[in-house]
Amino acid sequence: MITAIITGASVGIGKASAQAFLAEGYTVHNVSRRPCPVEGVNNILCDLTCDDAIAATCDELKQVITESQSVALVHNACQMRKDSTSQCTSESLREALEVNLVAANSLNQQLLGHLPRSSSVLYIGSTLSEKAVPGSFSYVISKHALLGMMRASCQDLMGSGIHTALI
């Protein structure tokens, strides 16, 4: 069995990713607060800002992983806020980073050691991973950081048989 675990697959790019993986024969698991409406997707409801919820979800996912020949762990969940340097409070930035970055780190930390060789860790980036536009302060910061996380992951996973990329 080949498996895709996608955070935030309930809407947008995550939902489209779920459809694409299903079309390629993957068993797809959506990890998010809301269910994915795509038929055939297994939903694991999880608040990605809550450490206990992530830990419980990872316990469930470890069983899924043990039954898989290959896993694509797709970090897609994201908050996109319209904010600016002068408007974004530290609390608001922390909330965005919790979903956009810290959740990916938590999932990696708890699941990487269980992924079989030939698996992949995919980060959903943006053109704003490398540039900026006005009115997207917290989003730009988090996407730049996600690119850094992928680059660091690439170095750390070298030789493990696990591929990583930012898309």
Regions found by a protein language model. Give the residues of each.
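N-terminal Rossmann NAD(P)H-binding glycine-rich loop of SDR-like oxidoreductase domains
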Residues: 10, 18
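Substrate-binding pocket helix/loop in short-chain dehydrogenase/reductase
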Residues: 84-85, 89-94
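Active-site loop-to-helix junction immediately N-terminal to the catalytic Tyr of the SDR YXXXK motif
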Residues: 88, 132-140, 152
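Active-site helix of classical SDR
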Residues: 108, 142-143
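Alpha-helical segment proximal to the catalytic Tyr-Lys
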Residues: 113, 155-156
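Residue(s) in the substrate-gating loop at a strand-loop-helix junction
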Residues: 126
